[in-house]
From Swiss-Prot:
Name of the protein this chain belongs to: Ubiquinone biosynthesis protein COQ4, mitochondrial
Membrane topology: Peripheral membrane protein
GO-annotated biological processes: ubiquinone biosynthetic process
Gene name as annotated: COQ4
Subunit structure: Component of a multi-subunit COQ enzyme complex, composed of at least COQ3, COQ4, COQ5, COQ6, COQ7 and COQ9.
Recorded family membership: Belongs to the COQ4 family.
Cofactor(s) in the UniProt record: Zn(2+)
Organism domain of life: Eukaryota
Main location: mitochondrion
Pfam family, one: Coq4
Swiss-Prot/TrEMBL keywords: Lyase, Membrane, Metal-binding, Mitochondrion, Mitochondrion inner membrane, Transit peptide, Ubiquinone biosynthesis, Zinc
Subcellular location, record wording: Mitochondrion inner membrane
InterPro entries in UniProt: Coq4, Coq4_euk
Listed pathway(s): Cofactor biosynthesis; ubiquinone biosynthesis
Amino acid sequence: MLSRISSVRIGTQVRQLANPVVNQSSQVLQTRQFYVAAALTVGSMIFGKQNKLADSIANGEVHDKTVDYEARHQEALEKRLKTLTDTRPMKPRYEGHIPLNLHEKLLLFVISGIRSYYHPENGVNIVQLGEATALPFILEDLKKTMLSDETGRRILREKPNVRTETLDMDKLSKMPKNTFGYTFYSWLKKEGVSPDTRAPVKYIDDPDHAFIFKRYRQCHDFYHSLNDLPIIIEGEIAVKALEAANMGIPMAALGTLLAPLRLKSAQRQRLYEIYLPWAIRTGLSCKPLINVYWEELLDKDVNELRKELGITPPPDLRKIRKERAALRKKFKMKYESYEKQ
């Protein structure tokens, strides 16, 4: 019995003596592992940089700032750009052209359509939606309309660009007040816009179609000024309806159908009773506006020009709005005076 107790005590003492040794060995092992890991990290940083440097030297990229180096660098850059451009369905066909795949065109239509509905004041949305809905067969039909007319053929051949410098605004300001040129100039000043505010075409693939759509876009303000319609939502809808009836532009038709939904009741009533009937009737009966060389008609009497084109201006929208505002103010004052009694 005594011997068994002694052996247990001896075993316990041995384990107690061995534990510090084991703990010390474990600490030494952990310390060694830490130093080894640190050494490997530092070594990889040093030798990794050396390897990169060696690769650069082997490729002739260090201490070789010669024409050959620049040529190789440019070639590498062009290869990278080529891999990006190869994803396009075609090469750009005119300045500023951005070719899109079919799914990209569909996305452009959906996204720009949603944005245009909720933010019609943002011109970028309207521009993108216009090009997304400008289908090739519609633009080709407009091209045939232009080719069937002598002036239209000349416009296609000469490809005029409606800009401030080409119109000579200073000259327009000095024209007689009955001329179309002065009418256009005074309308621009009244509305605070210029011919340079029209965005270039980007997403239409055919160069002729792109020019036709640009021409339609740049001539938009001529229609405004000829009919003295202001740049407010009612005036824009009226001009869009005129364009849709005359040229069949889908974007113009969409604007005519959807934009009135955001109007107030009085505005919508005015539009449906006066301006939409006028726009549709005038657009269907007047000369194709895409065939009008507006730049050559600036010195013409504005009333004679309207008569030649078959256009009769609508009632003055500014005057109607002003009269309604005055009437509302009168009723408001009358109501307030009645409340004070």
